[in-house]
C-alpha cells in the first residue's frame, strides 16, 4: 500500500485494448493519484502514459507512467488484463491453456515485489484465471477478485432498459455464473423500480420466451462485437473502473464480480459470478441471491463446467 495518506496507486498489467480502455476510464474519472502501466511492449506503455497524461488538465492531476513489476511493491491495486485475445469462433474457455501460462509469469513477480494490496483480474477465461491468481499468489480469497459477470450484468440491464423503455440504471438485474457460455439471467430476483421484471413483462405483453431470447442475446453479445470489430474493450474497461472505484473509495458497493465460493449456492473452491459487497479491503461479503430451483441448477452446472476446465488446465500446467 502507498505510504502517503490519501495517495492511491494502481498498477495495470496488460496494455492491450482492454487495458488501455480501463486506463482511459480511470483517467476520465480521476481515480487514483498514481497509475502505472506494465506490459512487455514498452513503447506502447510509454506512449499510452504520455497520451493519458495530456488528459489531466481536463480531469484531475495524476502521475501516469510506464513501469515494471517492481512498481507493484506499494500499490493498492493490481489489475490484470494481460492475455491472449479471444478470436472469432473461439470460446472464453478455449483460451484457458494459453492464458494460464501467461498468468503464471505475471503473478509471481508481482508478489515478489512485496505487493500487499488487492488483485483484480479481467483476463479471460476470467473465472478460471481469478482462481489461478489466488492459487499462484497465496493471497487471501477476499483480496483476489474477478470482473466476473459485471459486464454481462450491464448488458442485461441495458437490454431490459431498451425492452421496457427505462434507464438501465433503474434496472436491478444480474447475470450470474460463468462469464461465458453457461451464464444465466437471474430473472427471479430482477426488478425495475422495485417491481419484479416478470410482472412488468407480463403487463407489457412480453412473454417468458421473449425474456429467454433477450437473455440469449446478452449471452452472445460478446461474439457479435468480436465478429464486427475484433474485440470487446470499452464495456469491460468501464466495468473494471467501477470495481476499482468501489475498492479505492471503500464504497461497500454491491457489484456482480467473480468471487470465491465457500458453501454459497452449494458450491466450494471455485470463483464464479455473483453479487458481492466490494470495498477498501476487497470482497467484504457475498450476497447469496435467493435463486429459483431452476436458476440454482444453472449456477451449479456453470460451476461444474468451470471446475472441469480449471482442473484440466492446472494439471496441464503442472505437467510442463
Curated annotation (Swiss-Prot):
Protein name per its UniProtKB record: L-lactate dehydrogenase 1
GO BP terms: glycolytic process; lactate metabolic process
Main location: cytoplasm
Catalytic reaction equation(s): (S)-lactate + NAD(+) = pyruvate + NADH + H(+)
Functional summary from the UniProt entry: Catalyzes the conversion of lactate to pyruvate.
Pathway(s) served: Fermentation; pyruvate fermentation to lactate; (S)-lactate from pyruvate: step 1/1
Presence of keyword Lipid metabolism: no
Modified residues (Phosphotyrosine): 223
EC number, as in UniProt: 1.1.1.27
Active-site residues from the entry: 179
Superkingdom of the source species: Bacteria
Subunit architecture: Homotetramer.
The keyword Cell cycle appears for this protein: no
Places the protein is found: Cytoplasm
Binding site for NAD(+): 18, 39, 44, 69, 83-84, 105, 122-124, 147
Binding site for substrate: 86, 92, 124-127, 152-155, 232
Family stated for the protein in its record: Belongs to the LDH/MDH superfamily. LDH family.
GO annotation, cellular component aspect: cytoplasm
Higher taxonomy: Bacteria, Bacillati, Bacillota, Bacilli, Lactobacillales
Molecular function as annotated in GO: L-lactate dehydrogenase activity
Keyword annotations from UniProtKB, A to Z: Cytoplasm, NAD, Oxidoreductase, Phosphoprotein
Amino acid at each position: 500500500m502507498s505510504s502517503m495518506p490519501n495517495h492511491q496507486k494502481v498498477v495495470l498489467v496488460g496494455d492491450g485494448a482492454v487495458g488501455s480502455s480501463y486506463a482511459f476510464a480511470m483517467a476520465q474519472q480521476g481515480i487514483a493519484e498514481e497509475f502505472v502501466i506494465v506490459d512487455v511492449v514498452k513503447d506502447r506503455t510509454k506512449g499510452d502514459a504520455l497520451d493519458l497524461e495530456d488528459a489531466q488538465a481536463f480531469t484531475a492531476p495524476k502521475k501516469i507512467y510506464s513501469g515494471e513489476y517492481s512498481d507493484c511493491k506499494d500499490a493498492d491495486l493490481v489489475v490484470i488484463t494481460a492475455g491472449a485475445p479471444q478470436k472469432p469462433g473461439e470460446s472464453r474457455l478455449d483460451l484457458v491453456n494459453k492464458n494460464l501460462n501467461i498468468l503464471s509469469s505475471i503473478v509471481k513477480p508481482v508478489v515478489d515485489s512485496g505487493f500487499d494490496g488487492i488483485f483484480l483480474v479481467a483476463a479471460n477465461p476470467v473465472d478460471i484465471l481469478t482462481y489461478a491468481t489466488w492459487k499462484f499468489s497465496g493471497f487471501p480469497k477476499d483480496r483476489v477478485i474477478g470482473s466476473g459477470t459485471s459486464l454481462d450484468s450491464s448488458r442485461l440491464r441495458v437490454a431490459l432498459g431498451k425492452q421496457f423503455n427505462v434507464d438501465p440504471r433503474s434496472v436491478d438485474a444480474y447475470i450470474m455464473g460463468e462469464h461465458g457460455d453457461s451464464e444465466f439471467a437471474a430473472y427471479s430476483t430482477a426488478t425495475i423500480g422495485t417491481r419484479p421484471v416478470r410482472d412488468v413483462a407480463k403487463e407489457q405483453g412480453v412473454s417468458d420466451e421473449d425474456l429467454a431470447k433477450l437473455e440469449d442475446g446478452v449471452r452472445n453479445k460478446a461474439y457479435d462485437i468480436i465478429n464486427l470489430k475484433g474485440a470487446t474493450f470499452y464495456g469491460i474497461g468501464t466495468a473494471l473502473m467501477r470495481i476499482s472505484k468501489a475498492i479505492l473509495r471503500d464504497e461497500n458497493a454491491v457489484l456482480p464480480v467473480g468471487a470465491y465460493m465457500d458453501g454459497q449456492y452449494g458450491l466450494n473452491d471455485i470463483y464464479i459470478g455473483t453479487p458481492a459487497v466490494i470495498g477498501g479491503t476487497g470482497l467484504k461479503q457475498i450476497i447469496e441471491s435467493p435463486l429459483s430451483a431452476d436458476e440454482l441448477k444453472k449456477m451449479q452446472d456453470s460451476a461444474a463446467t468451470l471446475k472441469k476446465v480449471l482442473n484440466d488446465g492446472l494439471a496441464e500446467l503442472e505437467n510442463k
